[in-house]
């Protein structure tokens, strides 16, 4: 019996590879060297176009891919970890402005800025805590026998998040757009 999703469902694995190669051909697939057996894609995107930031991204499959077991799994079964720039660093830089804007940490949390940026969540990765892009509410992620959210679709949503986040960071959009949630 195969333990990992890509062994037990080689057709899904091939579909994932085909989608990424079609839409994000510069990304490469590898296996984490932490003993977990998890696969990940790594590459760079610049969704804001020339002159915008280039983002180095890892898309990390959970071993449960494509099955989402609860409505609390933000980001679904493909976690999106920006390596450069690092979200935690950006969030730490933004936190004084967030506190100035919202007055208290509790008020910042109430408005969705508890971590310093909209639509991110924290999780352990290796030996440190990292901030991941939350591309959609978990209830919108697909994960059953007939359909699932792919790395390519998760990265597409992440690119939209990056554009909106860059606009917000540059002052080109307000908090209400950043918190809209319809990424």
What does each model-found stretch correspond to?
Residues 1-183:
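UBC/E2-like fold recognition across ubiquitin and ubiquitin-like conjugation systems
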């Amino acid at each position: 019996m195969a333990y990992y999703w890509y062994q037990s469902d080689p057709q899904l694995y091939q579909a994932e590879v085909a989608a990424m190669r079609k839409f994000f051909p510069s990304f490469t697939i590898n296996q984490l060297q932490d003993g977990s057996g998890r696969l990940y894609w790594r590459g760079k995107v610049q969704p804001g176009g020339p002159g915008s930031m280039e983002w180095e991204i890892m898309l990390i499959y959970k071993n449960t891919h494509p099955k989402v077991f609860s409505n609390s799994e933000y980001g679904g079964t493909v976690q999106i970890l920006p390596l450069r720039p690092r979200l935690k660093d950006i969030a730490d830089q933004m936190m004084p402005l967030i506190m100035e804007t919202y007055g208290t940490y509790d008020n910042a949390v109430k408005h969705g800025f508890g971590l310093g940026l909209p639509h991110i969540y924290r999780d352990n990765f290796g030996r440190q805590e990292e901030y991941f892009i939350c591309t959609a509410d978990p209830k919108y992620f697909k994960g059953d026998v007939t359909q699932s959210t792919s790395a390519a679709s998760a990265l597409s949503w992440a690119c939209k998040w990056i554009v909106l986040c860059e606009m917000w960071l540059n002052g080109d959009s307000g908090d209400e757009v950043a918190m809209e949630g319809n990424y």
